[in-house]
Amino acid sequence: MDGVSLSLEPGRIYGLIGPNGSGKTTLFNCITGIERRDAGRVAFNGERIDGLKPYQIALKGIGRTFQVIRVFPELSALENLLVVTRGGLAEAQARALELLRFVKLEGLRNEYAGNLSYGQQKLVEFVRVLMRDPTLILLDEPAAGVNRTLLNDLLDAVRRLRDQGRTVLLVEHDMKVVMGLCETVFVLDHGEKIAEGEPGVIQTDERVIEAYFGR
């Protein structure tokens, strides 16, 4: 990353796009403490978090999904959510069922995660992130490999999170999803931020067009 600066406000959906290798996942890793930056700072709610471990950052209220699905195939959908909880089991189960209902998977709560479709597994991972009630949610390619019906359920859930006052930052290669969902889009190329703005502005930005298609 080279001098990348992002500022996120509560209750908004942001997109982070760029060609392959532009630094999108690296930026997510820096925010969540998986990778250490050489310079600069990461602040959340006015507090520097760049020196914290990943689990400490998660406890501050930042949740994140990954490009590669990370579910436990031999656990049920419900159990996959319960593995990240602390405290009373009854309260955790109620919260997990509420979240499965949030993405229309309550009826599959007892199904082994390994038997679910790829898209359903993505939804399980998505709501597992919500079990800790984060206020900033980072989604890494949420639409990849998801059929249209499940994708619509996921996008509706993201909008409802925004309406609850949460902030969502997503990396996504599906430009239709980005342009239809995000209110502000950041564009990276070779580790630098080359553009920032509303989707309509980004679509016509010459620097963005050149980054994707060349001259």
Please report, for each region that a protein language model flagged, where it lies by residue.
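Glycine-rich phosphate-binding loops of nucleotide-dependent enzymes
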Residues: 1-215
